[in-house]
């Protein structure tokens, strides 16, 4: 999957670890949405 920025990672992608994975069809079982706003397409999820 494509890494994405969770809310807990910090405000921007610069210098922060991207701990989430981008899922287009929603978070799979056992994962949760870790970004309150965005991304525009898909969901940023982490285990």
Curated annotation (Swiss-Prot):
GO function term, MF aspect, one: toxin activity
Disulfide links within the chain: 4-44, 6-34, 27-45
Family matches, as InterPro entries: Anenome_toxin, Myo_ane_neurotoxin_sf
Keyword Secreted: yes
UniProt name for this protein: Delta-actitoxin-Ael1a
Pfam families reported in the protein's UniProt record: Toxin_4 (PF00706)
Function: Binds specifically to voltage-gated sodium channels (Nav), thereby delaying their inactivation during signal transduction. It strongly stimulates mammalian cardiac muscle contraction. Paralyzes the shore crab (C.maenas) by tetanic contractions after intramuscular injection.
Annotated family: Belongs to the sea anemone sodium channel inhibitory toxin family. Type I subfamily.
Localization per record: Secreted
Organs and tissues of expression: Expressed in ectodermal glands. Not expressed in nematocytes.
BP GO terms, sorted: regulation of signal transduction
Gene Ontology, cellular component aspect: extracellular region
Protein origin, superkingdom: Eukaryota
Keyword list, A-Z: Cardiotoxin, Disulfide bond, Ion channel impairing toxin, Neurotoxin, Secreted, Toxin, Voltage-gated sodium channel impairing toxin
Chain ranges passing through the membrane: none
Organism: Anthopleura elegantissima (Green aggregating anemone)
